Curated annotation (Swiss-Prot):
The gene is Zcchc2. Keywords: Metal-binding, Zinc, Zinc-finger. SUPFAM superfamilies: PX domain (SSF64268), Retrovirus zinc finger-like domains (SSF57756). It comes from Rattus norvegicus. The lineage of its organism: Eukaryota, Metazoa, Chordata, Craniata, Vertebrata. Disulfide bonds: none annotated. GO terms for molecular function: nucleic acid binding; phosphatidylinositol binding; zinc ion binding. The keyword Zinc-finger applies. This is Zinc finger CCHC domain-containing protein 2. Residues 574-588, 636-655 have a biased composition (Basic and acidic residues).
Amino acid sequence: MLRMKLPPKSTHPSEPPPDAEEPEADARPGAKAPPRRRRDCRPPPPPPTGLPRGPPPPPPSPPRGLEPPVASGPTAGAGMPGGGGHAAALREQERVYEWFGLVLGSAQRLEFLCGLLDLCNPLELRFLGSCLEDLARKDYHYLRDSEAKANGLSDPGSLADFREPAVRSRLIVYLALLGSENREAAGRLHRLLPQVDAVLRSLRATRVEGSRGSVEDEPGGDDEQDAEKDGPGPEGGGCAKLGTGGGLGFRAQEELLLLFTMASLHPAFSFHQRVTLREHLERLRSALRVEPEDAEVEPSNFAGSRAQNDSACGDYIQSNETGLVEQAQIPQDGLTVAPHRAQREAVHIEKIMLKGVQRRRADKYWEYTFKVNWSDLSVTTVTKTHQELQEFLLKLPKEFSSESFDKTILKALNQGSLRREERRHPDLEPILRQLFSTSPQAFLQSHKVRSFFRSISSESQHSFNNLQSSLKTSKILEHLKEDSSEASSQEEDVLQHTIIHKKHAGKSPAGNVATSCALLEGLTMQYAEQNGVVDWRNQGCAAIQHSEHCVSSADQLSAEKRSLSSVNKKKGKPQVEKEKIKKTENRLSSRINGIRLSAPQHAHGSTVKDMNLDVGSGHDTCGETSSESYSSPSSPRHDGRESLESEEEKDRDTDSNSEDSGNPSSARFAGHGSVTQTVSVQPPADTVSLGTENGNLLEAPLTSHKYPHIPFMPTLPCVMHNGAQKSEVVIPSPKSADGKAVGVLVPNPVAISTMMESTNAAPVGILGPAASGESEKHLELLASPLPIPSPFLPHSSAPALQLTLQSLKLQPPQGASENCPVNIPQQAATRLSIGSPNTALIPVHNPGAFPGSPVAATDPITKSASQVVGLNQMVPQIEGNTGTVPQPNNVKVVLPAAGLSAAQPPASYTFPGSPLAASVLPTQNSTVLNTATSAQPASTGISPAQSTVPPAVPTHTPGPAPSPSPALTHSTAQSDSTSYISAVGNTNANSTIVPPQPLGPCGSCGRRCSCGTNGNLQLNSYYYPNPMPGPMYRLPSFFTLPSICNGSYLNQAHQSNGNQLPFFLPQTPYANGLVHDPVMGSQASYGMQQMAGFGRLYPVYPAPNVVANTSGSGPKKNGSVSCYNCGVSGHYAQDCKQSSMEANQQGTYRLRYAPPLPPSNDTLDSAD
């Protein structure tokens, strides 16, 4: 640190120290002053080489600048007295010190130091932090008050006029003392920073006044010097000779550079603020590079190291040590040399191409997007508004463009403000493209044109040092495509509409991607950075009965919708238009990879008004991620075949996004995973198309022999869950007669390959138009592979129903097709809502084939190895007086789908005729749900040799019950206010209720165990409801559960009606018996009340090792117990005295100074 301050004294003791702060040191350095005035990114000449050799300029030797000491050491040492490798390295180090302390200004020193800090490792940074703390502690008390003001919440006062030195000094002090995490104070200082446009105007005023007046004007210089001496910073008195009274002097320019440099590097500012400040700093540096003060530096002195530090170092402005030295060294003719040289060396424009014209949504004017080719082989894309372009051409000097060019351009631009029917020319875009492509060289190489197409404003874009993802993507794509197409090609037009064009009101123009999505493969990186959704235009298939028209409609992909700030929010439409849009359109947003789902993704079905056939391909949307569409509203619909005059209609489409996000009339389908394809079937139409992963369509008419009509069957769409490794198909619900939605959720184990296969002549009840007169309310069947939380299903709010399940059958695969007959009579003109995700009516689990073998993902029609559970007849009936109680309007049946083993014989199994206890659905009026099966002999049970499929297992579904107790009371319907279950007897064919029959051979537990006549029935497929919803699979237990009916507390029936509900011991989540004993089960002679499984609230797992006790004293523990916390036997984890395992978790970062010893307990992996 000390050597950096006094490098000449330590290196050359015989030479007097060049104290730059003394005014008498002006004449000593001689020719060293011009290099210190450098403001471009070129290394200055080495100042220490001239110091030991006296006042004359040094002989021409290669300048060192910031060259690495290792590379330039031998060369430097050869020409120096006492040269050598070590001495040369020392001298190079001293040259760096002197260059840093004497040549660089404050802004460049800070930027250089921050660049060096980025090259240090963390331990070096901590060491440097300690050194900085020690150095900063010396001035802590002096700067304490200023630091409190900088980080406080009080208003710093009026700091608007940046021309005042006191204002600039206070801003610099506040930025220097601002804490690294004080975002609030940083935002306040960001608002107080000067506007870069005002600074540039002041610089231009300084340049104009300096060219007219005398630079050596003593009165003005003295005033400027007196004003600048009051400024802050480490500098003492600023320079005085070059500034004028109305402009900005050297000291003010350096302070402004320091101000913007500190703000752009300060960690307290946000990323967006720092990027914006960096752009302002670059504009300020560009303006200072063409200042007249850098005219005298010979270009030959820097030929060797011109391109080395072009981007690393900043503008080399004179520091405080050299400010007074340079005042007497500037000649008079230096003011006219610099502009020509800067103009000669500047990068100019080689070609301007008009990419596209788009009407703005905020007003009726147009936007123009230009592709600019620069002389340094860079390509930028700039979007200018109609007003900006017109004002620029009107203010253009005469010498830069021809008169005919101006007249033609302005004539075309004036037509841009007119409507299309009022224009004389049919299209404006070809005219402007031709005019800009044939621009004269004087127009292209002028400074005003270059600054116009390089400027950064609120209405334009710029790609130099611009971190916007759209422009980065545009620049990358232009480099990839510059040898393949012209600006008027279709691919660039698509890229123009999808990427380059800037959205001013948060709305996206339409892009017609009719060829394929392959030409948008480069947009993948853009979608990850912008919030947007992909929408599908559906109006083209509204009234078309042919599927080939729908193929072109499905390929219309609109541009992404960029999420802008709250300033650019959309203006609301009148209420009349909003209501009209609500009634006419109900759009579905994209969720993952172009899949159409509603914005509020609920699980219950409702009215669907979208009757179009839309096919969304999983990989054709070019990289849309799930994080975009989760936080984005529904995107507007844009028809690619529409012209530019339909922007007003697109405005109305876009402004209705916020209403659709909360629209309850959207079709809602939710599953455990993503859905990759969408197929909507329209009942009146005769065409169905199933989309594959590749975007292909498989068409087949519904009127053929493959799809025989079922006269009483309403159209039921199917929804495939992502439960297995197979491509899924989603069919949104079509609209019925009165708008009621019909939906069938079919998980992956249930195959729907019968929709496209015709080898079996059995009727398929999934597809087919409804011909019944009473089909305004349909039955919704929901089959889920695993239990899901019950609030996702609506429950019935009507009086009690009795569901008759006749001849439940399971059919294994036969031949090449599978059948899913769902026959619904005309009496079932309601929505049944029976059961919930916890309800296990027909649990069929397959140890061998579950969840199905993976098939090709591109074929959604491929069969799975699982089975189809068919309901031949489902008749909802009313208990008691059937004519007086209204039917419910929302009834569902939940069937957990599963498959049978492939090794099972192809025979139909019939369930035994024992009554079926159903699930409880708590309703608002506390009704009773009675469920029964058809009467069949009990001896027709399934033998173990045939199948392991048990009969329908009743479990309990609590739902959002008003009662806080999970247990269900068992009283009569007249005296009980909560929902309960009454298991009734069988019903005959005409659905009349017969008296209740006994519950089977084992009436105490309800299980068809080995204590009765059904001893052959093995029970290894009963499961408790899954406490964690999601695509999880559990295999059945390897051992069958023993009977617990003899002598346990389960045989203590205490229900009032004599019928005891079934109780089942589910599979334990732990196989080693580490679950605690039940509390109530330990009490002797206690009749345990059957409780509903609140799987969605908390898991209820009874003890797995409960053994029957003949004395009736309760269950016993089988074997010794152990604690999983400490591993010691004899107690459970809840009684463990040791600390919990979770409390001992430590961090993973370790400092390793040497290899650990062999018995070390270091847990780091080999990578560390």
